[in-house]
Swiss-Prot record:
Cofactor descriptive note: Binds 1 Mg(2+) ion per subunit. The magnesium is bound as Mg-PRPP.
Superkingdom to which the source organism belongs: Bacteria
Pathway: Pyrimidine metabolism; UMP biosynthesis via salvage pathway; UMP from uracil: step 1/1
Organism name: Edwardsiella ictaluri (strain 93-146)
Protein's name according to its UniProt entry: Uracil phosphoribosyltransferase
Length: 208
């Protein structure tokens, strides 16, 4: 599995701001979107382009445009919505697929409860977004769902990842690509990432 920990100074700075315990909902939400945008920049660096001729101000001009790759952004509800706008800044014409999965706090197992995928998803590259890759259960379940629907090109974008979640994802889906702003220390006994960000969903939606 291709694993990319994005080490750009802006990413590290913004993620560091997000780790503040008393950060406001507004600021956390803004930063989640901004880091999501920067991760998208990295994750789409290998998209192919083709030369086309357009009408410029001084006549015909040859430019490069992305070659035919259709994209669907897949936020995992609910926290993934906090990164979605940042992703769409770079791929505004992407279609949105939505997957709802929550983690049972006792068993730590993923529980699917909603899905709405775009049509012809087998023709699209999926950018799956979720702030945290902890145990990996929710992400694995989401990718299972996408593959069962025919999607084969899948990239995962997360703000922070635990080594345990990375290992689980790699074992289940070695063909996906992972882009993260940080590979953190690991999980505590409750399955939370340390040092992590706390409950990203609560911080994004103001329910903490």
């Amino acid at each position: 599995m291709k694993i990319v920990e994005v080490k750009h100074p802006l990413v590290k700075h913004k993620l560091g701001l997000m780790r503040e315990n008393d950060i406001s909902t507004k600021r956390f939400r803004e930063l989640a979107s901004e880091v999501g945008s920067l991760l998208t920049y990295e994750a789409t660096a290998d998209l192919e382009t083709e030369k086309v001729t357009i009408d410029g101000w001084c006549g015909p001009v040859e430019v490069e445009q992305i070659k035919g790759k259709k994209i669907t952004v897949v936020p995992i509800l609910r926290a993934g919505l906090g990164m979605m706008e940042g992703v769409l800044e770079h791929v505004p014409s992407a279609r949105i697929s939505v997957v709802g999965i929550y983690r049972n706090e006792e068993t730590l197992e993923p529980v699917p409860y909603f899905q709405k995928l775009v049509s012809h998803i087998d023709e699209r590259m999926a950018l799956v977004v979720d702030p945290m890759l902890a145990t990996g259960g929710s992400m694995i379940a989401t990718i299972d769902l996408l593959k069962n629907a025919g999607c084969r090109a899948i990239k995962v974008l997360v703000l922070v990842a635990a080594p345990e979640g990375i290992a689980a994802l790699e074992k289940a889906h070695p063909d996906v690509e992972l882009y993260t702003a940080s590979i953190d220390q690991g999980l505590n006994d409750k399955g939370y990432i340390i040092p992590g960000l706390g409950d990203a969903g609560d911080k994004i939606f103001g329910t903490k």
